[in-house]
């Protein structure tokens, strides 16, 4: 099983980190663990992420490409290597929805933030938007981390 993670960085908004496994034989994804916390230092987040890296032997961490300073700090100061996530929002949401709709994602019941984010994720109702986009709320951070992981892992492993 390959183990990988998604990371959405925030400060006032929470930093969200989700750990997933992919079973190549069954072609199923497993959400194994999560971390969500706000108003913490980079060092505090790094400590939790390192703990999860050691616990799960994570192969890849896909991070929001807008978080380049955090990406550099993690690599330089905490030996946490990350890869920029694919961020095509609508394609990524469609990809995750396909996985969920086809019963290919199993979520550990202890991952309460992830369960909640999938239940509460919604589109922004603003009729003045030029295109659809997800509503920014407390559910969106873990959902973004999950999207970064699932969309980037799938596309990076099937592109060869």
Question: Which residues does each predicted region cover?
Answer:
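Short, hydrophobic alpha-helical segments
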Residues: 149-157
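Mg2+-dependent endonuclease catalytic cores in nucleic-acid-processing enzymes, primarily RNase H-like
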Residues: 18, 24-137, 156-160
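Short beta-strand scaffold segments in enzyme catalytic cores
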Residues: 15-21, 147
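Basic, amphipathic alpha-helical segments enriched in Lys/Arg and hydrophobic/aromatic residues
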Residues: 141-147
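Anionic group-transfer/hydrolysis microenvironments
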Residues: 8-10, 35, 66, 146
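Residue-level detector of short, conserved catalytic/binding motifs and their immediate flanks
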Residues: 15, 59, 143
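ATPase catalytic-site recognition across NTP-hydrolyzing enzymes
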Residues: 1-9
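Coil-to-beta-strand transition motifs
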Residues: 11-14, 26
């Amino acid at each position: 099983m390959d183990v990988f993670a998604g990371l959405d960085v925030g400060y006032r908004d929470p930093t969200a980190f989700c750990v997933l496994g992919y079973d190549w034989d069954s072609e199923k994804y497993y959400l194994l663990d999560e971390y969500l916390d706000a108003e913490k230092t980079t060092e505090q987040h790094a400590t939790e992420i390192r703990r999860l890296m050691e616990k799960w032997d994570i192969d890849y961490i896909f991070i929001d490409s807008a978080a380049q300073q955090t990406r550099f700090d993690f690599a330089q100061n905490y030996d946490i290597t990350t890869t920029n996530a694919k961020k095509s929002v609508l394609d990524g949401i469609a990809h995750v929805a396909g996985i969920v709709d086809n019963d290919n994602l199993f979520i550990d019941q202890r991952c309460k933030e992830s369960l909640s984010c999938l239940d509460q994720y919604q589109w922004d109702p603003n009729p003045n938007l030029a295109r659809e986009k997800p509503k920014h709320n407390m559910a969106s951070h873990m959902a973004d981390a999950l999207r970064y992981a699932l969309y980037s892992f799938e596309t990076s492993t099937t592109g060869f």
